[in-house]
Amino acid sequence: MYGIEYTTILIFLTSITLLNYILKSITRIMDYIIYRFLLMVVILATIINAQNYGVNLPITGSMDTAYANSTQSEPFLTSTLCLYYPVEASNEIADTEWKDTLSQLFLTKGWPTGSVYFKEYADIAAFSVEPQLYCDYNLVLMKYDSTQKLDMSELADLILNEWLCNPMDITLYYYQQTDEANKWISMGSSCNVKVCPLNTQTLGIGCLITNPDTFETVATTEKLVITDVVDGVNHKLNVTTATCTIRNCKKLGPRENVAVIQVGGANILDITADPTTTPQTERMMRINWKKWWQCFYTVVDYVNQIIQTVSKRSRSLNSSAFYYRV
């Protein structure tokens, strides 16, 4: 009997000793792994000095403070600037080194080499389809053209604001706009847009829903159309779908890291009077037209003042993807 008790006690003590040994071994192994990991982190931190310019990476968070207008301002070292210009600018300059020249000039204003990106676009229609406003700050140069002033004004409204859009099937359904922030956006090589307001019996008001020729014309041969109709009223739409797409969109608010610079023109585009533009902050500027070199020199000279009108933020880097979000 005493032998059985001694054996039980011995087994119990042996188990405790073995468990204690195992726990100590696990502790030593974990300490080894943790210390090695921390050592590697310290070593890598001393030899790696990477900078994230944010290109092709999502930017989220609250609005940052506007930077001071100074050629010695160090915050620009961690910011990127995209300058969008029409293809005719590079064609006129005809210099393979012109971007390098501008980069060196931007350096004198506190923008390091490699922080300024030059983005070329063919025309307003192509740019409106896929703006790709990737940088922390985005400046869009648009040369004034009296034949495209409506497209220019609506392009400014498109890129200076953020929109949530859904596709529309105008062959099957009637549509109505719920409030002032609700617009119908059409874009393509040639957009003709006609509307027919309907009463509560779905009969046309001043038009016949079966005859598009009686519809009210709101746009003719435009590349970009932002249509605003009477809220709360159903409409039958007629759009040249072969050369144009239309979407039902909601203006979410200002895209605060974008500024539009109008180049030349006697008339000045201004969308701040739009009641849906809140806050009504002027982020559209105009510079006199001479030659494209002169325009770029002006932008470089006043870049830090222009940056004061915008903020380093954006809900979506790829504005076209955000625009087509369904």
UniProtKB/Swiss-Prot annotation:
GO terms for molecular function: metal ion binding. Residues 253-255 are annotated as: GPR motif. It comes from the Viruses. Residues 1-50 form the signal peptide. InterPro entries: VP7 (IPR001963), VP7_1 (IPR042207), VP7_2 (IPR042210). The keyword Signal applies. Residues 165-167 are annotated as: CNP motif. GO terms for cellular component: host cell endoplasmic reticulum lumen; T=13 icosahedral viral capsid; viral outer capsid. Keywords: Calcium, Capsid protein, Disulfide bond, Glycoprotein, Host endoplasmic reticulum, Host-virus interaction, Metal-binding, Outer capsid protein, Signal, T=13 icosahedral capsid protein, Virion. It is found in: Virion; Host endoplasmic reticulum lumen. Ca(2+) 2 binds at residues 177, 228-229, 231, 301. N-glycosylated. The N-terminus is blocked possibly by pyroglutamic acid. Glycans are attached at residues 69, 238, 318. Some rotavirus strains are neuraminidase-sensitive and require sialic acid to attach to the cell surface. Some rotavirus strains are integrin-dependent. Some rotavirus strains depend on ganglioside for their entry into the host cell. Hsp70 also seems to be involved in the entry of some strains. In group A rotaviruses, VP7 defines the G serotype. Calcium-binding protein that interacts with rotavirus cell receptors once the initial attachment by VP4 has been achieved. Rotavirus attachment and entry into the host cell probably involves multiple sequential contacts between the outer capsid proteins VP4 and VP7, and the cell receptors. Following entry into the host cell, low intracellular or intravesicular Ca(2+) concentration probably causes the calcium-stabilized VP7 trimers to dissociate from the virion. This step is probably necessary for the membrane-disrupting entry step and the release of VP4, which is locked onto the virion by VP7. Homotrimer; disulfide-linked. 2 Ca(2+) ions bound at each subunit interface in the trimer hold the trimer together. Interacts with the intermediate capsid protein VP6. Interacts with the outer capsid protein VP5*. Belongs to the rotavirus VP7 family. This is Outer capsid glycoprotein VP7.
